Amino acid sequence: FEMQYCWSHSGVCRDKSERNNKPMAWTYCENRQKKCEF
């Protein structure tokens, strides 16, 4: 996957685009502007 902007929740970084109505879990994200790596 390429790096995408994400939003964090409970210390978990998730992708904005949801799959099967569930946010995809990514690596830890310290802020909403940070990009997540697969």
UniProtKB/Swiss-Prot annotation:
Q: Which organism is it from?
A: Ornithorhynchus anatinus
Name the residues that span the membrane. Answer: none
Xref: InterPro entries: Defensin_3 (IPR012553), Myo_ane_neurotoxin_sf (IPR023355)
Q: List the disulfide bonds.
A: C6-C36, C13-C29
One family from Pfam that matches here is Defensin_3
This protein's major location comes to secreted
In which tissues is this gene expressed?
A: Produced by the crural gland and detected in venom from the spur located on each male hind leg.
**Recorded GO CC terms:** extracellular region
The protein's name in its UniProt record? Defensin-like peptide 3
Q: Does the keyword 4Fe-4S apply?
A: no
Q: What does this protein's UniProt record list under function?
A: Does not show antimicrobial, myotoxic, hemolytic and cell-promoting activities.
Q: Which UniProt keywords apply?
A: Disulfide bond, Secreted, Toxin
Q: Where in the cell is it found?
A: Secreted
For molecular function, the Gene Ontology terms on record are:
toxin activity
